[in-house]
UniProtKB/Swiss-Prot annotation:
Lineage: Bacteria, Thermotogati, Thermotogota, Thermotogae, Petrotogales
Coiled-coil region: none
Matches recorded under Gene3D superfamilies: Aldolase class I (3.20.20.70)
Family statement: Belongs to the TrpF family.
Name of the featured protein: N-(5'-phosphoribosyl)anthranilate isomerase
GO molecular-function term, one example from the UniProt record: phosphoribosylanthranilate isomerase activity
TM segment ranges: none
UniProt-listed Enzyme Commission number(s): 5.3.1.24
Pfam families, A to Z: PRAI
Superkingdom, natural source: Bacteria
A biological-process GO annotation: L-tryptophan biosynthetic process
Record gene name: trpF
Length: 207
């Protein structure tokens, strides 16, 4: 079964409605982004969520103190590292870890070997300049077929109701990450598009 994460949650209404729609995880971006949310707001949102929905803290090149603050909050199940972090800060994280690898071409796959032995999950996103996720663009999924991936992985990057089935059938990820293509505007999700995407995922029959 494909797990579903929706990233860029900024408000209680979206968090509750998306949780009810049947997703597995919500992503909260704590780094600079149009979808940035303060940790205090995540604490507020988290109190309204059902316990079976995982919470993911999305960070970019955090210092040790930021990770310790996330750990002490007792809110999150995972930390998603979306920058060019030193391996030690990921290794020392006490929560489950997701390492984002931004894909531009085949050479992007070289990054995987740095983290293969200790992260819990990989997330593959589209590289567009220096943007940190939320680009709304897909990458060439065929590239991942040549990757030496030892861990479960999440597919991100421009996923929508229109392309989600093809994406899953092409590379068979363990999970998908929805963001900019299921929004009304940055930080405000379109629950109709999310439900439509979930329905299409649930309809897939992979041989």
């Amino acid at each position: 079964m494909i797990r579903i994460k929706v990233c860029g949650i900024t408000n209680i209404e979206d968090a509750i409605n998306i949780s009810k729609a049947g997703v597995d995880a919500l992503g909260f971006i704590l780094a600079e982004s149009p979808r940035k949310v303060e940790l205090s707001k995540v604490l507020e949102i988290s109190k309204e969520l059902p316990p079976f929905v995982s919470r993911v803290a999305v960070v970019v090149n955090p210092v040790k103190e930021e990770i310790e603050k996330i750990e002490r909050s007792k809110v999150f199940d995972y930390v998603q590292f979306h920058g060019s972090e030193d391996v030690n800060i990921i290794k020392n994280c006490k929560l489950k870890t997701i390492k984002a690898i931004k894909i531009e071409n085949k050479s992007s796959l070289e990054e995987i070997s740095k983290y293969n032995d200790f992260v819990d999950y990989f997330l593959f996103d589209t590289k567009i300049g220096e943007k940190i996720g939320g680009t709304g663009h897909t990458f060439n999924w065929e590239i991942l077929k040549e990757a030496n991936i030892k861990k479960p992985f999440i597919l991100a990057g421009g996923l929508s109701p229109e392309n989600i089935v093809e994406a899953i059938k092409t590379i068979r990820p363990n999970a998908v990450d929805l963001n900019s293509k299921v929004e009304l505007y940055p930080g405000k999700k379109d629950i109709r598009l999310i439900k439509e995407t979930i329905d299409r995922i649930n309809s897939i029959k992979i041989k």
